[in-house]
């Protein structure tokens, strides 16, 4: 008998949500996360209305909204600094939901905690150094200079765009050439509006600026441009 039904490599939003859902359905699940503590990085912190509907269906919405989530109600689109319309996304999208923003590291922590409450075993600060595919796959873990192999019925790789699980599983990867770049910053005590997000487009320079409020006078700002226009 395998040690686990499922071993999930990666304990971020996707890995923790999947593990929680499967544990609630009776599976024996282990999550292995290499980070001992989640760090702030520039990444998406805005969940579209359809994503909020998915969060409800996955059973993680209440965890997110109670721990770190925030609902800006509107979307302000601006062209070269001039507003061309403030849109109520809940009133104008099929799922009738407001989008959700959140601080990514806290969302990761909240979902890992929810997964543990559902019965998931979580190992943090542990690296996966090998996955052996087969009828009974095995996963080799490494921590504090020691290695151990565990067997499972299914390995789920949720270890990011540089996934080693994908490589160990023999899956092909296709990448587009770099065409855009994106930079972001988290600002506290900002005077930016808290009730709507803002997208400012400059099509002539192929650039975009985004502001996503997270409540409590905190917002994430992004600046994006095509690679050729970033100078």
Predicted regions and their residues:
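Core beta-strand elements of the Rossmann-like FAD/NAD(P) dinucleotide-binding domain
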Residues: 2-4, 145-154
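Glycine-rich FAD pyrophosphate-binding loop
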Residues: 23-43
């Amino acid at each position: 008998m395998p040690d686990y039904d499922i071993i999930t490599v990666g304990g971020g939003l996707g890995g923790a949500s999947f593990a929680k859902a499967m544990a609630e359905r009776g599976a024996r699940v282990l999550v292995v996360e290499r980070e001992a503590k989640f760090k702030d990085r520039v990444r998406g912190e805005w969940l579209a209305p359809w994503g909020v509907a998915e969060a409800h269906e996955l059973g993680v919405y209440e965890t997110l909204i109670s721990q770190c989530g925030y609902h800006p109600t509107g979307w302000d689109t601006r062209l070269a600094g001039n507003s061309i319309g403030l849109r109520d996304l809940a009133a104008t999208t099929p799922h009738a939901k407001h989008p959700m923003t959140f601080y990514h590291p806290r969302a990761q922590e909240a979902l890992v905690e929810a997964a543990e409450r559902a019965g998931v075993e979580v190992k943090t600060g542990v690296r996966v150094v090998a996955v052996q595919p087969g009828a009974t796959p095995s996963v080799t873990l490494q921590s504090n200079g020691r290695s151990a192999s565990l067997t499972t019925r299914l390995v789920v790789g949720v270890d990011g765009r540089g996934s080693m699980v994908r490589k160990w599983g023999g899956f092909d990867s296709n990448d587009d050439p770099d065409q855009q770049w994106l930079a972001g910053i988290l600002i506290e005590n900002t005077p930016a509006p808290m009730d709507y997000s803002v997208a400012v487009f400059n099509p002539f320079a192929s650039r975009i600026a985004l502001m996503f409020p997270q409540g409590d006078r905190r917002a994430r700002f992004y600046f994006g441009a095509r690679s050729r226009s970033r100078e």
